[in-house]
Amino acid sequence: MALLKVAPSRLLSRALQLASRVQNCTPTVTTARRNFHFTVYGRKDTSAKVSDSISTQYPVVDHEFDAVVVGAGGAGLRAAFGLSEAGFNTACITKLFPTRSHTVAAQGGINAALGNMEDDDWRWHFYDTVKGSDWLGDQDAIHYMTEQAPASVIELENYGMPFSRTEQGKIYQRAFGGQSLKYGKGGQAHRCCCVADRTGHSLLHTLYGRSLRYDTSYFVEYFALDLLMENGECRGVIALCMEDGSIHRFRAKNTVIATGGYGRTFFSCTSAHTSTGDGTAMVTRAGLPCQDLEFVQFHPTGIYGAGCLITEGCRGEGGILINSEGERFMERYAPVAKDLASRDVVSRSMTIEIREGRGCGKDKDHVYLQLHHLPPSQLASRLPGISETAMIFAGVDVTKEPIPVLPTVHYNMGGIPTNYKGQVITHVNGEDRVVPGLYSCGEAASASVHGANRLGANSLLDLVVFGRACALSIAESCKPGEAVPSIKENAGEESVANLDKLRYANGSTRTSEIRINMQKTMQNHAAVFRTGSVLKEGCEKLSVINSSMDDIKTFDRGIVWNTDLVETLELQNLMLCALQTINGAEARKESRGAHAREDYKVRIDEYDFSKPLQGQQKKSFNEHWRKHTLSYVDKKGKVSLEYRPVIDTTLNEDCASVPPAIRSY
């Protein structure tokens, strides 16, 4: 703790000690307060050295790796140990201990056409995912993900993931929303593999356990600040060690961003407080685009008043949504799928019920999820976590009474634009171009397999398929031990200057005050239903709130475990995500998937698919909205938008593309 009061020269001495520790560390490294049972700095990182080129106020340590992964959730772990398994000297930087990552909160399951409950085909899964995306998903990436799904689940089983089982010993698969057989003509599919209702917890711990087999260098509780970019190429990451305030520059030939979503831009969400869009913001500050951030998924069943997630698996097991009249109202909105329609459809239906006065409770501002008609033994075996969560956060015994629920922000379909190999792309002169050295996967990325709306249980699949894809792509294009490109001597100095600016910020507005203003603006102006006037007002309000960042006040001037500073850095990241989200929503004058405009209620494609195509003239690219939004933010907070086409072709003839059609359940 002496670092709080020592002079800059003493800090440099501390940095020398850090570098010495890096060069001489053993498999177990003793830090100031704990023993980690895996290497923190890594045995191979003998090239780490002290630099004073960007700061004399902070210890600065330079590292060199073949690859750096930012984030240690499901996608980050799968990418990291995939790279280490292929022989790459790999670092994994994470602001959380790996098993604290938000993947742990996923409940329902992971989709794969295993066919354990009835005959199934990955092509039917492909069709459902394209339809679920409201035809904004890129079909080459969806083809890749759904075809890889069965092998990915079997791989997890081989890693030791304890899937729920049928009486015959096969992996149990439950029904989930938007899933069908025979291209929508064969009834409800049972495609969701699960570990009761704790699938994300099991997945994360399984991947973490597997990762310990490999010699990955984990830098735990390091906050990634920015990408190190040179001439349009990514050459690594600069990060803050939260434990001692040292700065670390990770120079690498390949960088993978797997930092998760930005759910905390909204006031009510199912996301952890750490879901702050760090990677998305890093890409934005690097001058690269983000894609489709206006598409924010509202999960139909967050606990009323608490926002905690109640898995879609409840409805997959037979749970139903009812209004104040006791009516199973989804039968009116989705006559075939009913309570297992896609999430955007169910969330809008619930909102309409509440608006029209059929909500529950004294304020009629929520609906009920009924489970007590199901056998208690089924609830105990298939939904044990939900039974516990409902009792803790709603005071409800699910065997006797319904759970009060409300649509709650849950997932970000948009993110960092990538191709199906995980390579980050930009769109220049009508063509997609790869950003050399930069990859992304998981919720941080937009491949785009989810398009305008994600199907439940496709997110965990996304993590493992594209985490692995990033590792495979790097292994295809690079070899372990290749020369790592150099960086400028002053690379990262802007990041350190920003860190110092926030650490000593002495304005009049607390970080928490600006954050709550941003979150409530997003909640009130970019919710389930949106209108142009409300979105425009939200854009103007958010611009003012962003300007108030210049008047921010922090209180902790130290560098050791400065949570005030870290929360302010996270607020900067959230603000960049929020600006792009609401401006993209205001500009998109149609309704598609999770983006529902009350002043533009129809989906605007190249053709009107509600009518015969014969005789219709195809709309030009500028006239229709079946295209991806690319958003940029300049240093003053001004958002600019561009657009790129949706990819309608599949990878090969094994799977036919699905042409746009009316989307109904």
Swiss-Prot record:
User: Which GO BP terms sit in this record?
Assistant: mitochondrial electron transport, succinate to ubiquinone; tricarboxylic acid cycle
Q: Which cofactor does it need?
A: FAD
Q: According to its UniProt record, where is this protein located?
A: Mitochondrion inner membrane
Activity regulation: the record says: Enol-oxaloacetate inhibits the succinate dehydrogenase activity.
Q: Does the keyword Transport apply?
A: yes
Catalysis performed (reactions): a ubiquinone + succinate = a ubiquinol + fumarate; (R)-malate + a quinone = enol-oxaloacetate + a quinol; (S)-malate + a quinone = enol-oxaloacetate + a quinol
MF terms (GO), sorted A to Z: electron transfer activity; flavin adenine dinucleotide binding; succinate dehydrogenase (quinone) activity
| EC number, as in UniProt | 1.3.5.1, 1.1.5.-
Transit peptide, from-to: 1-45
- Flavoprotein is among the record's keywords: yes
Query: Which residue positions are annotated as catalytic?
Result: R343
Q: What keywords sit in the KW lines?
A: Electron transport, FAD, Flavoprotein, Membrane, Mitochondrion, Mitochondrion inner membrane, Oxidoreductase, Transit peptide, Transport, Tricarboxylic acid cycle
Give, as in the UniProt entry, the pathway in which the protein acts: Carbohydrate metabolism; tricarboxylic acid cycle; fumarate from succinate (eukaryal route): step 1/1
Q: Tell me what topology the record assigns in the membrane.
A: Peripheral membrane protein
The similarity annotation says: Belongs to the FAD-dependent oxidoreductase 2 family. FRD/SDH subfamily.
Function field: Flavoprotein (FP) subunit of succinate dehydrogenase (SDH) that is involved in complex II of the mitochondrial electron transport chain and is responsible for transferring electrons from succinate to ubiquinone (coenzyme Q). SDH also oxidizes malate to the non-canonical enol form of oxaloacetate, enol-oxaloacetate. Enol-oxaloacetate, which is a potent inhibitor of the succinate dehydrogenase activity, is further isomerized into keto-oxaloacetate.
Q: What is this protein called?
A: Succinate dehydrogenase [ubiquinone] flavoprotein subunit A, mitochondrial
